[in-house]
Amino acid sequence: MNRVVEILAPAGSMECLQAAIAAGADAVYLGGTRFGARAYAQNLSEEDMVQAIEYVHIHGRKIYMTVNTLLKDREMEELYAYLLPYYRAGLDGVIVQDIGAVKFIREHFPKMPVHASTQMTITNTLGADHIKQYGITRVVPARELSLGEIRDMKRQTGLEMECFVHGALCYCYSGQCLLSSMIGGRSGNRGQCAQPCRLPYQIDGKKPADLMSLKDLCTIDILPELIDAGG
């Protein structure tokens, strides 16, 4: 099957964004100063984000912003003020974890496309079909799914599928890990993951080893099959 896919690249800084566009990416995604899963990354300021939106659109590409953490009630109004300048600048969509934030964004920014983050832990077709009622148009399914599961989700829901093709994997299902919060007071679901799974651990006096650090995801050998599955 010949399918046109969107190559979406991460862009943690303006330099990375420009490099991704120059390399041929169809779209980029990045975080702003709040509500992103990488609170300690080199995220863009409001001024830089607006400039990034303009830069990407000049080159005929798309730009999505992450709002992929869990939000508290008091933060919803703050979310409105945070997103408003980007909405006005023409942001192409937001990648969201919190279902309450999805509902809020759909109500206050009705023309803003909303994508379900992998942090939402969509692992089955029923879950993907359920979130359609909130106006979600694209889902980033859990990275642990098989090609067959992705294919079934695509066929039965009609949602766009966005799949990771390379990068680190979480020790737990995305959006479900509490390890960083429990042992370090830094919640991964609030953008503060300290990545304790990357540290060496010693068991029963044996030599310290990377017991919880998974191998990186790499799908280059199965890209045609992934595309055919709907990814």
Spans of features found by a protein language model:
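Conserved nucleotide-cofactor-binding alpha/beta core module
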Residues: N124-L126
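As written
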Residues: G135-I136
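Active-site pocket-lining/capping segments in soluble small-molecule metabolic enzymes
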Residues: N2-I122, V140-E144, G148-G231
